Amino acid sequence: MTDDSNKTTHFGFETVPEGEKAGRVQGVFSSVASKYDIMNDVMSVGIHRLWKEAMMDWLAPRAGQKLLDVAGGTGDISFRFLKRAGYGHATVLDLTESMLVEGRKRAEAAAMADQLDWVTGDAMALPFADNTFDVYTISFGIRNVTRPQEALNEAFRVLRPGGRLMVLEFSQLPNPAMQKAYDLYSFNVIPRMGQAIAGDRDSYQYLVESIRKFPDQDTFLKMVRDAGFENAKFRNLSMGIACLHSGWKL
C-alpha cells in the first residue's frame, strides 16, 4: 500500500491529503444516494442511458460471465449487463454502503437478487483473489478514486486471462468553444439542480469539478496500458463529453 501520509490529491478543485479523499467522496455519495439515479437523468437529460447502452454494445456481454462492477453504486451497469448476458453473475463493489442499499432495493424489485452480490470496498485494494472475473466495469467512478492508476492495476489483477476492462467516464471536449459552453452549463446549472432535487449543492459542485480534473482521453489511455492491458482503445461519446476506454488482459 502506498504511503499517503504526506501526499496530496485533488477533491474537486481543492487540494487535500490523500488520506482524506476517500472519506470525503464517501460523504458526497452518502448524501445523494437516494436521489442519485434521478439526478443522473436530470443532469444529462437522459443521455447517460444512451452512453451506458453504448458501453453494453461494445462490451457485448455473454451468458455465464462473471462481472465485477466497481463503484457500481445502485447497480445500474450490473443490471444492464445481466439483462444483455441472459444469465450470469455480477458483484457490485462500492465505497459507500448507502449506495449499495439503494441497489439492493432495485435488485429485489426486479427479482434479480440471486444474480448479484453487494460488497463495500475500495477500488485500490479489491477484496478478491487474482484471476477471478471475466469483466471489470467502472462507470463514472474512477475519477473519484484517490489513485486511479492503482485502481487500474487492481482491475488487471482480478481479471482472468482473456478478461476485459471497460471504463465509462466523463472526459474532455476537443473543441475549446464547445468545452466553454459545456462548462457554463455544468458550473451554473448542475449545482443548482443538485440543490433543488437532492437538497445538496456542494456535492454536485464537487462532481462538476472532479470532471474537470480528470485526465483527457489520451492520458487515461496510457494509464490503461501502463496497468498491463493490451488492445487498449477509447471511443468518444457525445463528442467527448463522455468516453469509453477498453482493454484486455491477455
From Swiss-Prot:
It catalyses: a 2-demethylmenaquinol + S-adenosyl-L-methionine = a menaquinol + S-adenosyl-L-homocysteine + H(+); a 2-methoxy-6-(all-trans-polyprenyl)benzene-1,4-diol + S-adenosyl-L-methionine = a 5-methoxy-2-methyl-3-(all-trans-polyprenyl)benzene-1,4-diol + S-adenosyl-L-homocysteine + H(+). The keyword Transferase applies. Belongs to the class I-like SAM-binding methyltransferase superfamily. MenG/UbiE family. S-adenosyl-L-methionine binds at residues 74, 94, 122-123, 139. NCBIfam families: MenG_MenH_UbiE (TIGR01934), PRK00216.1-3 (NF001242), PRK00216.1-5 (NF001244). HAMAP family: MenG_UbiE_methyltr. InterPro entries: SAM-dependent_MTases_sf, UbiE/COQ5_MeTrFase, UbiE/COQ5_MeTrFase_CS. This is Ubiquinone/menaquinone biosynthesis C-methyltransferase UbiE. The gene is ubiE. Methyltransferase required for the conversion of demethylmenaquinol (DMKH2) to menaquinol (MKH2) and the conversion of 2-polyprenyl-6-methoxy-1,4-benzoquinol (DDMQH2) to 2-polyprenyl-3-methyl-6-methoxy-1,4-benzoquinol (DMQH2). Keywords: Menaquinone biosynthesis, Methyltransferase, S-adenosyl-L-methionine, Transferase, Ubiquinone biosynthesis. One of its GO terms (biological process) is aerobic respiration. The keyword Transferase applies. Pathway: Quinol/quinone metabolism; menaquinone biosynthesis; menaquinol from 1,4-dihydroxy-2-naphthoate: step 2/2; Cofactor biosynthesis; ubiquinone biosynthesis. Its EC number is 2.1.1.163, 2.1.1.201. GO terms for molecular function: 2-methoxy-6-polyprenyl-1,4-benzoquinol methyltransferase activity; demethylmenaquinone methyltransferase activity. SUPFAM superfamilies: S-adenosyl-L-methionine-dependent methyltransferases.
